[in-house]
Amino acid sequence: AGSRVESIPADHFNHCVAVVKLSSGTYMPLDPTWVPFCRELWSSAEQQQNYLPGVPEGSDLCLTPVSAPENHYVRIKANNKLDAKGTLTGQFTITAEGQSDSNIRGMFTRGWQSQWKNMLESQLLNVSPKARLLSVDYGKDPKDYQAAPIKITFRYEIPEYAIPGKEELVFKPMVMNNLYNQVKSYLRINTDLPERQYGFKDGCSRLVELDETIQLPKGYTLLNEAKNESKQSDAADFKGSLSQDGDKITLHQKLALKKRVYEAADWDGFRSAVNAHKSFGDYKK
């Protein structure tokens, strides 16, 4: 296998994998390098790359298929409460599958158990250095990657999360404030560029769903107008909303990134969806 393999020279291959013949007669690649601690038998971090099966009937070069974004979902659901002093209290649950699961679960499968709590706390400290982890529930055995998709629930308190002003509080939604950015590989792609002449790569196709409810102190209202936005293209889709009902603000986002390897022509659709997603990051009460 290799990210790009020419038709003849064998020295373009960088490692060997295996294939299994399915009942349909098609061949499915298996990669023993990445199967341990991964919930798929072929690493989708290597989708859209060349491989050459060594089969009795012979084969030409093949291309590993695109993996649907929903195979690699990451979902964060937060329920928070903000007081007039700017202290945020609440809980969030993160769930993930596929390559997103492997990214989040890695601290359990590759890290020291004595450091689990510190590493989980660091996710909150990325949001605010004043964050306090009250409790965390990662199930009975988070190393058992074959049992189910990863699920972790945090309870926390963050003093001075919101910046108080004259009869106002300014803050960013927690689910968009450096929370588990490690799995959001698309954030490492500069979407300020208006156009690209060449193709580009992300870590993996991915589905990102972010939901947050924030209960405001009595008398506070959202200054920004309610927001609904959607984008669709062959490269990426986005749908998001922000609204207030009573004393609660509700944020919802769904970002589907459909490939790992993109052509230059995909840039406008990818960039538009990711920038729309980012635009929900700031608002003021």
Predicted features and spans:
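A sensor for short, sequence-defined functional sites
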Residues: 1-285
